[in-house]
Amino acid sequence: MFDCVLPTRNGRNANAFTRKGPLRLRNAACRHDQSVIEPGCLCVACRPSTGHQEGGFSRSYLRHLFMAQEMLGPILVSLHNIHHFQSLMLDIREAIKEDSWSLLYERWPVLERKRGCQNEPA
């Protein structure tokens, strides 16, 4: 992956990247959300670990970490964001190799939404 502070800077500020678009973990909507940042993601923040069969750290717990100014929150979200961009770059390389851009847009709905001159909110 290229050298960029985007994943960690956003992670430190409670912004997580997902295939469907950005997720702001400080928002009140995450207060009671028991889902992980991105279901199916295999990063350390999202994947099931020993004792947590249903998944990794919930959005509500991550929000709590940020609100309490605990360092674990920024660390976990930064690791998730780095994993997110590594997965994106891997899929882009595969799409180039296989000339299958439509498959890339299926896997990454956020890219489809941004394509063209659409007047949709980001």
Residue locations for each model-derived region?
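Alpha/beta catalytic cores of nucleotide-metabolism and tRNA/nucleoside-modifying enzymes
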Residues: 1-122
